[in-house]
Amino acid sequence: MLKTRAMFPHKDQAMSLSLDPQSDLVVGHTNNRPITNPLALSLLIGLNNKNKCISDSDFVRSPKSPLEFRVLSTMADSFFLRSPRSSLTAHLNCCCGPAAKVGLSIVDSLGDDRCLLPDIVFGPALRIKCSEVMDKHPKLLFPVANKSKKIENERSGVVFEIGDNSSETEPVGLRNRSFSANDCLRKTRVLSRSKLGQEGDFPGSGSDNAFSSEDDMEDYTCIIAHGPNPKTTHIYGDRVLECHKNELKGDEDNKEKFGSVFPSDNFLGICNFCNKKLGGGDDIYMYREKSFCSEECRSEEMMIDEEDLEEPCIDMHESLKKLF
């Protein structure tokens, strides 16, 4: 009986130490082989969650462990959750202070009205201040009021003086007015400085200085259209004068006057001394932009020019003798 009782504990111990045919789990016995059965691994997961007796490093040793995501999660706590950007931002905050203040200061400066650029004033909005001469003669080419209006910009502090027109009820823009050829002639002569002393029929014209300021103004523009229907347009400030006829009657006189100074188109086709026609193969002799057929004609022209130059020299010499 004692032998049989002694054998039962050995049988129970042998049964407890036997292996499960469905799993490789060993109870109470250390096995050095790696655990590859997924059922056994699932049991180990439960044991790890309940008893905390198996560490994560034990599961890493198994090449087929389904708990690799747990290892990655533990590694992400130290590596992936702490991004380089966050670490760099923390380092900059420790060294240089918070960088958000710099960006906010830039945004605040952009939103500030004082940092805006000054207003741009275009040409039509700007006028030239009237001179004292035009104040004395208000009935010149165009009526101009004596007072000026000051426009002040509150932010930029720039002040412009703008001349007011007497007709304030007229719409803004260019106001076209057509005149006859005589009126256009009479009024446009004022704008020519070379004709100021010759013309005296214009009202208010007393001296050349009275209209010199108008000729120098930047608001005046003259447009001359040539062709079968010549037309001259005078733009003075915001006023337009249109003349449908060529009012410059002295154009032909000017051509005759300056014809001797400027050479004609066919100045190489004729001799300037004997009026001989010059062909394409003939020799041409030049002197002061004049063509000659021979050296004799050119020398004769040169002698005539020398005589013309000697006469004023002789007169000057005689006048000097009288003085001394």
Curated annotation (Swiss-Prot):
GO molecular function ontology, one term from the record: zinc ion binding
UniProt keyword annotations, A-Z: Cytoplasm, Metal-binding, Nucleus, Zinc, Zinc-finger
Task: Name the residues that span the membrane.
Answer: none
GO aspect biological process, one term: response to salt
Induction remark: Up-regulated in response to mild as well as prolonged energy depletion. Induced by NaCl.
Quote the function comment for this protein: May act as an adapter to facilitate the interaction of SnRK1 complex with effector proteins, conferring tissue- and stimulus-type specific differences in the SnRK1 regulation pathway.
Q: What protein name applies here?
A: FCS-Like Zinc finger 11
- Organism from which the protein derives: Arabidopsis thaliana (Mouse-ear cress)
